[in-house]
Regions:
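Cell-envelope/extracellular polymer assembly enzymes that use nucleotide-activated donors
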Residues: 3-6, 25, 38, 188
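Short, well-formed alpha-helical segments that are part of the catalytic scaffolds
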Residues: 14-30
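Membrane-interface aromatic/basic loop that binds lipid-linked glycans or pyrophosphate carriers
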Residues: 65, 115, 272-341
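Glycine-rich, basic loop-to-helix element that forms the pyrophosphate-binding segment
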Residues: 68-84
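Donor-binding/catalytic cores of nucleotide-activated saccharide
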Residues: 73, 94-203, 208-227, 247
Length: 341
């Protein structure tokens, strides 16, 4: 029997006590028939922690549980999607949860609510959505006091958290995670979605909680973004291959402009100029040089107005985060980068 909702969960080293809050938060959803819900869990390899059968069968909705060959989080997300039967799908991390008992009721209501979207430049009323993006909550810890805090993630387009998709839309457009991407992989799927539809609803009220976990590398290592910046460029390269193969050139030009300007302002930040980060900066610049060599033609084709809009947003972000002044002009940066390739 096909379901209305499929909640797709990659799983590796999360024991029962860690994944239980997620499954519990689904079980307490109100005004939703539990027969309409399935959770699809995919274990990443034979060394993944085995979830007991009696534990999974204790829930009032169906759970598919699959042990897959060792790969990575993107492959597990794709595998779970392939197993799913729901009309609408969403991905959730095994160590997160829904923090409101009305999350699925709200999303289902929005699948039946009309909205206006521009189709060929004409405002058109459509029912439901191809994608629903929402604010989500992030749980954090004060590094000095250990005190818990929560913040609204309103700019979370680089995350998959709190997003629902019409399954048929994803299948029809061949939208998937990149199988060889395991870091900064979420923005790949989000870019594909935005390139294929304007039928995206925005929910300003959060219902997904990105929980704190003590061994989370991405939030505990202060050098995480510097160490993984080449992975961000790799994800962008994958997106550009996908977009150009689909002849989505306007979106591809925006992506190149975004990464190019992000690299420029990021490398101007004082934190990238310390002895501690020199190794990461050198590696990231060499990786970006190869990227820019491949996609420079799209940068050159991107309208100046688009570049200016993107530049303004990124520069404002970096100033807020501590950049005082550009240490070189954009032209100087690009000329220097070209000499690295």
């Amino acid at each position: 029997m096909n379901k209305f909702f499929s909640i797709l969960v990659p799983h590796y080293n999360e024991p029962v006590e860690v994944i239980k809050p997620l499954l519990d938060s689904i079980a307490i959803q109100q005004n939703i028939d539990m027969n309409e819900i399935e959770v699809v869990i995919c274990d990443d390899g034979p060394d993944a922690i085995l979830l007991p059968d009696e534990f999974l069968k204790s829930y009032p909705y169906d759970i598919q549980y699959h042990r897959e060959p060792k790969a990575n989080v993107s492959v597990m997300r794709n595998k779970a999607f392939d197993y799913s039967t729901g009309e609408y799908v969403t991905w959730a991390d095994a160590d997160d949860m829904y923090y409101t008992c009305l999350a699925l009721w709200f999303v289902k209501k929005e699948t039946q609510t009309p909205m206006q979207v521009p189709i060929n430049g004409v405002p058109t009323t459509v029912n439901g959505f191809d994608a629903l993006y929402s604010v989500f909550l992030e749980e954090g810890r004060n590094p000095q006091t250990g005190e818990t805090y929560f913040i609204d993630r309103k700019d979370g387009f680089q995350f998959i958290h709190g997003k629902f998709f019409r399954r048929e839309f994803l299948v029809r457009n061949g939208i998937r995670f990149g199988d060889d991407l395991s870091i900064h992989e979420d923005n790949v799927l989000n870019l594909q979605v935005q390139a294929c539809t304007q039928n995206i609803k925005w929910c300003p009220v959060p219902f997904y909680l990105w929980k704190w976990r003590d061994n989370s590398v991405c939030r505990r290592d202060p050098l995480y973004l510097k160490k993984t910046y080449p992975d961000l460029i790799k994800s962008s390269n994958y997106s550009l291959e996908w977009l150009t193969n689909k002849s989505k050139f306007d979106k591809a030009r925006e992506v190149v402009a975004s990464i190019t300007l992000d690299a420029y302002y990021t490398f101007c930040h004082p934190s990238w100029k310390t002895i501690e980060t020199q190794e990461y900066r050198d590696g990231a610049e060499r990786y970006f040089a190869e990227y820019f060599k491949k996609w420079e033609y799209l940068w050159n084709e991107c309208p100046d107005q688009v570049k200016m809009q993107i530049s303004s947003g990124i520069r404002q972000r970096e100033v807020i985060q501590g950049m005082e002044m550009e240490t070189e002009t954009l032209e100087q940066f690009l000329n220097r980068i070209k000499n690295l390739s």
